[in-house]
């Protein structure tokens, strides 16, 4: 249906099913049908339909019939009443000597849905053959009315003792004594295996005439035959008509009671030549034609007693015996000696027993046919695990006959060298259908190579097989292939999944079991993982039974149920796996344990069947076998509740107050809550279901913004009855008062559930039971309700440029600063030594419409740490930053949440501290403004501000020097011996200490030491140089040793200052790296060269060692003074006798006297030598005496 504009429908959860321990199989009301536990009632179970009435067919393979444990099958009504034994264990197979004790009838059951018949098998049914019992197995078919209709025994073959033996006995007068002949008869008859399907014996006595002592079918046991033979009297006669007796036996004895196909054996016993020997040739020819094997016994008593040569007699008897004579001819000395040939005669008659070279003679004797069974279109597949020396086989019984594949047909997958492994092929049988190959049979061999194997094959009427594919197990002893099930998930008559059980798979120290999943892909089954059992590690034998069942959860896909009969301490459990599309979901939808159904259940899950609706409610039900019980689990209908919610009006306009609530103006709205139930099963399209629901407003807020008119912010436990397919709606009135947050929508939550979850319909697994819909606030923007902001961000820092630093800090004029900045990039900014922070002044302005959820994103380079944000104005707008420890160099700040108003502006200051651990040659600060409202691209360029500066750092260092020698006086009597033959020693130290915040690098220390004059005279010798920092690398340049040892005359009085500008020097250059507060010292150790200092001409001499700090070309550090330097000066003075010439002394004296005379003359001319007399002023008194 179409809803009006503004309808909000909840997003439902995915329909893909999830996990649950309780779904739609009812565990509260099971039907538990009890039977005899000792009979293993429940070992197999099948659902059965007879004219609409539902039954369970339950196998009890250890059931007793009379004194024998034959096993049997019960029919059980599914609703009420007791089970009835069908007495199929009393069924007898004629014409065989059968043994029915422990034949395990009901060990396998197979139903035929076409005619509602079923097959119950007795794989251990056996019959007697000679000295052996052959366990060939047998199955009994019952019709739809549970009545026996047919015996199926394809492995049953005629015994090698299937013989009709006629003894032709000479009873003429010459036979004596007769009692010895009777003893011979009794002894030889006791060696015969007489019984149905084995040996029949008839006796003909002849002389002059021939009579039947008894016919072949007169007696069916050794006891009866021996009893009858013991009463045979000698009939006598004067003639011995052996030819007549043989013909009589051939033509009459083999016809009266003889069996078709039975081997004909004739034993002729006589004591003399025949009176009708001319007829022997014809008689023997007729016997050969009838395939009568003849054993002839010549009794020589008559000849020996009379001393007659028996040669002619013996030749006649040999002629009567079949060829070769050595195997068919016997002679004894007399009648008493007949007892001596009993064993030999018996052995020769049965010489072929057990050694027949027919290819199947040893193949099917122990086949145990019916160990597994499976109904197909044209017959029945039967597993024969004991066939071919227990390698196993699969036989097929059809209306046209039976198909028994040759042993060689299996050799491709079951090679001869592994025949002693007892593969047990046929342990389970099933079939699959592919679009290309049609029906393909599947059989498991769980003991093949100890790991198990499954083969997929086609069977042909010429007894050959075509094996299409083989699947192999992975673990020794896991019994892979002991259970196999094919699944047509989507019901398109093509198999989608093949499941293979390995119930003894060992995992986590337990026999947990495993079920392998194979999907059909291009007519081959491809491994696709395993089904999941419970996570409780126990001996469960998960996969002992796997059943493909009809759609249980009514989603149109067939499902699978897996039994774990040993789980939960042998109480047992079953797992229900749902089908989906062409797959079986790996995780169980429901796990049902025996303990939750009824007390005392054991081995629950040993058999499973689910194909019929047993209680006429339109749903498929489950039948599960347990030890001594059969359990019926009823399916519950599945319903889907579709919930929807819409509001009138569709948005909350807090600027429009249209009602009063609790005396306050409010905005009133209505919510319409609607439910539509959908039953998945067609049978329930007119059903009803009751639900209960709760409604809550703004459930996740401590103070809800919306309230229900009925009071509060929620109401609970409302009940409503819904009809299938019909919509039911309810109006819920609510209101909104003033709120500060009108950006986030108001959430309206509804939780609903079935009114009676334990009975009636079941809510579909995975179907949502919660509906959350939000009603938004009107945003106050233009008519299309789409806000378009225009954010403008501006930012600048307080860092000085190189020019500003030069003028303000260094105090230089602009002209000098122009040349100062030439060594830097014009974009370089200077970090003064006292600076620890960087400040950014910024403004954010919204020149457009409201910006909802506006944010300011702040990020900085790693050498900065965010310190603070200070708002600079008193506007209503605010900025609040969120601390995120995981994002150290990023910060997100909310601007005037929930929205930044149109035409609003906010100014703020950002402070960043320099990092103590990260040092970079640049810094970067990025500011970006954004919001949930969409800004036009044409105005988005000014939403960001990027401050990126290349930096130079002002180094703050303390640079000092000290020296052990500052002045030395060279005296004439100065001796070198007191100075180790060199001169006075000195020790200079230059110390540099980093007083700043940043680590210093890219700086060199250059020390120049004057070593000698330009004339080659040594001034001092540098003996050693070292530093106190191991990470300081230094290079020394210049020659400090190769100067002349004898000084030459050189006058230094005109240039007494000796330094790097006028002397040969040694230069020491070191790379300097200093962490904050770290210091390093440079040490120079040497001696003044006294020999030269005494020889050179000077009065006073100063030798200066200079140390200067120099920045490298790309160094990030600068100094306030250009290349700061420190000097150490050695001041040297010299005492010496000066010889002045006489003419200089005389000239100087006369010159001095002349100069004195001229000075006196000048003073005289000026009146310097006259007395000064003052005139007294009038009025003055006399001059004081003291003044005079």
Swiss-Prot record:
Residues 1165-1188 are cytoplasmic. The gene is Itga11. Keywords: Calcium, Cell adhesion, Disulfide bond, Glycoprotein, Integrin, Magnesium, Membrane, Metal-binding, Receptor, Repeat, Signal, Transmembrane, Transmembrane helix. Ca(2+) 2 binds at residues 551, 553, 555, 559. Residues 1-22 form the signal peptide. It is found in: Membrane. It comes from Mus musculus. Belongs to the integrin alpha chain family. Glycans are attached at residues 82, 95, 291, 331, 358, 449, 462, 528, 642, 694, 857, 894, 973, 1031, 1039, 1059. The integrin I-domain (insert) is a VWFA domain. Integrins with I-domains do not undergo protease cleavage. Heterodimer of an alpha and a beta subunit. Alpha-11 associates with beta-1. Interacts with RAB21. It is a single-pass type I membrane protein. PANTHER family: INTEGRIN ALPHA (PTHR23220), INTEGRIN ALPHA-11 (PTHR23220:SF21). One of its GO terms (molecular function) is metal ion binding. Residues 23-1141 are extracellular. GO terms for biological process: cell adhesion; fibroblast migration; integrin-mediated signaling pathway; substrate-dependent cell migration. InterPro entries: FG-GAP, Int_alpha_beta-p, Integrin_alpha, Integrin_alpha_Ig-like_1, Integrin_alpha_Ig-like_2, Integrin_alpha_N, Integrin_dom_sf, VWF_A. Ca(2+) 3 binds at residues 613, 615, 617, 621. The lineage of its organism: Eukaryota, Metazoa, Chordata, Craniata, Vertebrata. This is Integrin alpha-11. Residues 164-345 form the VWFA domain. Integrin alpha-11/beta-1 is a receptor for collagen. CDD domains: vWA_integrins_alpha_subunit. SUPFAM superfamilies: Integrin alpha N-terminal domain, Integrin domains, vWA-like.
